[in-house]
Amino acid sequence: MSSLSIAIGMVVDDAIVVLENVTTHIERGSDPKQAAVHGTNEVAISVIASTLTMIAVFFPLTMVSGMSGVMFKQLGWMMCAIMFISTVSALSLTPMLCAQLLKLQKKQSKAFTMFYRPIEKSLDGLDNWYARMLNWSVRHRSVIVIGCIVFFVASLFCAKGIGTEFFPAQDNARIAVKLELPIGTRKELAQEISEKLTNYWLEHYKGIMKVCNYTVGQADSDNTFASMQDNGSHIISFNISLVDPGDRDITLEQVCDEMREELKKYPEFSKAQVILGGSNTGMSAQASADFEIYGYDMATTDSVAARLKRQLLDVKGVSEVNISRSDYQPEYQVDFDREKLALHGLNLSTAATYLRNRINGAVASKYREDGDEYDIKVRYAPEYRTSLESLENILVYNAKGEAVRIKDLGTVVERFAPPTIERKDRERIVTVSAVISGAPLGDVVNAGNAIIDKMEMPSEVTIQVAGSYEDQQDSFRDLGTLAVLIVILVFIVMAAQFESLTYPFIIMFSLPFAFSGVLMALFFTNSTLSVMSLLGAIMLIGIVVKNGIVLIDYITLCRERGQSVLHSVVTAGKSRLRPVLMTTATTVLGMIPMAVGGGQGSEMWSPMAIAVIGGLTVSTILTLVLIPTLYCIFAGTGIKHQRKVMKRKRELDVYFEAHKDEIIKK
């Protein structure tokens, strides 16, 4: 569906060029059938070349890897198919319909005249103004070139005010909240707090919040999925659903920020995490700057993580900072004495197995019903396995059937230990994640790196930036390489069409101004440079050169008909102005709903549409002036070179005629 939305404005470009040229021939008095044939033949090569340049842009997208590849592979295939079909239709169906439906009407109705005559006068006035302006431009070439260079350099200053991010966060109307009370908090108290918060949120966000569910308690040992999550009697997890974005006046990010501020009023929460989108992963997740701290000694890395967290909270745009390593939890550990085990005829494995079965349970039998089979687990009742004294009195039987208490085999002690030990590349790691709200990811990462540079770091500890920023840099690198490849492919296509390296070189001068337009559009709309806006910039490579191809192709046609360089440039510019403006207008108008549209998913595609609108608008305006001017410069240089060659040839002919006898004698 996104491919169709993007292609709506582009799919009619080829038909517009063909239809406009056929209409021009009919207005000059040609028969509609002859006009359809001759008009289509005149622009067929440029239409095909324009389509090939678009395919050269979108086909490489099918080979991108990583997260960007997942996003853009289908887009690339769909756009290639759509552009191919639109070109075939423009070169076959459009001329046929023109021959059958178009005719020069000498008398028009009054209503048509009243409506169309002002538009026609305006367009004719625009054509004449552009012809005069183009006539002045080609006679003041240095002014035009210098002015365009100054404009390009000035637009680069907009880059300083543009932040970077991976993907824009999407409003999917979901929020997850994870709260931690002090370890050891009773489940009844956690449920009471959960119920209180649920009622408050449903009342405070009435008309905005649809559902608010919560879970409290420790997962059972046979609940594999739940046991992999952080859980316990002191941990509360909320799953919240809001109404659709179009049905509320507040954004999902604003709701999350308000909830974070409200949770700060509860001192009983040791940790409070509000997760936009309901998950920390995926393209709907809120942007976060992740700093990975590597080090073997856990006390040292915990200290570094705590210091980094305190300083990151002071960074502008950071609404929440989380440390991946959970608080140390109390647990009972049994230190077995091997001598006592041997004395009672037991080994370490047997004693540990007995202890585990009595606490976690052992499968004693099976229960079968309706063809299904269920395990029956047997274990001690909670009052006999939850305190230090009860653990010490658990009985273990040796081979003789003698019962021995755990306290007679070792010592039961209470210790604090981390729930999990994270590792990456076989090294211990703790991650500090700064949740970003209202600031670009790149700015927060730069601020974090500045903090790290000033911190006194133990020699055995290292910190690396990871997460979304690492994915962003990889995607930017891949898309940059892709852009270079696309530029080369587009140049090859144009060189094959014009059978010249000069004309493609002239057309390529429109690309820098497309990127100027992208920077200006992102700057003035307060948007960030993300993977999506880069995709829009890459799309412009194919869209922008289409206008240049149409101009240069018609200038070449006028030159072949015997017109001078200046006359060819002005004639072609005046003739191709309307199709260039129409194709640009259809693409821009097709992108406007995507740029300003609401609903879920609009946040992702909006930067791409903004980039295309800004880049195409600026490049079209400058292309209509700069490309003809550059053509005159290169054509004038070529003519001067030809004159020098012809002059030398004449001089050689004169010299040969004057010294012919001497040369023959020698």
Regions found by a protein language model. Give the residues of each.
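Hydrophobic transmembrane alpha-helices and their membrane-interface caps
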Residues: 1-24, 31, 63, 81, ...
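Transmembrane alpha-helices and their membrane-interface boundaries in multi-pass membrane transporters
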Residues: 8-22, 43-63, 70-116, 238, ...
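Extracytoplasmic/periplasmic membrane-proximal domains and adjacent transmembrane bundles
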Residues: 19, 302, 309-486, 490-498, ...
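Alpha-helical membrane-interface segments at transmembrane helix boundaries
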Residues: 36-48, 68-80, 126-141, 163, ...
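Signature of alpha-helical transmembrane segments and their immediate interfacial
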Residues: 43, 114-167, 257, 291, ...
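Transmembrane helices with small-residue packing motifs
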Residues: 62-71, 143, 149-185, 225, ...
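Flexible hinge/switch segments at interdomain interfaces of large molecular machines
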Residues: 97-109, 166-174, 229-239, 270-288, ...
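Solvent-exposed, membrane-proximal periplasmic/extracellular interface segments of envelope transport
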Residues: 189-284, 339-361
